[in-house]
Amino acid sequence: MFEDAMVPIESYEIDPHPNYTLFKLHTKKGTVPLYTSLEVNENLRREFRRPITHDIITGVVAGFDLKIMKCIIDHVEDSIYFAKLYLDRSGEEIVSIDIRPSDVLILLKTTKFPLFVSQKVLDATAQEGI
């Protein structure tokens, strides 16, 4: 769908601050800064006794025999990032769901899939030296 406009996220860093968490999403073409709440960093670091949203997503994906194909951070508006998670339904169809990029980063803790940023988001937000 966005094949020619996707740039792979090669790595990311977590930079916690007193009032927010900064994720630095690194591509070959620049770094995209993604600011999130402190709660996102906490969800990445802690083990929870009960399932949180990301555990439930993983369970639903497995329970319905879905496979996460990729995620694309495809839009930014007023400093808010938007993403789509692409799911393969047993080879029958690929569906996309709207998802917050911060949720994707937590989901990547337990599930491996490619993460991309659209060229238009990269052009609008990329910074060097952060």
Where on the chain are the PLM-derived regions?
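Divalent-cation
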Residues: M1-I130
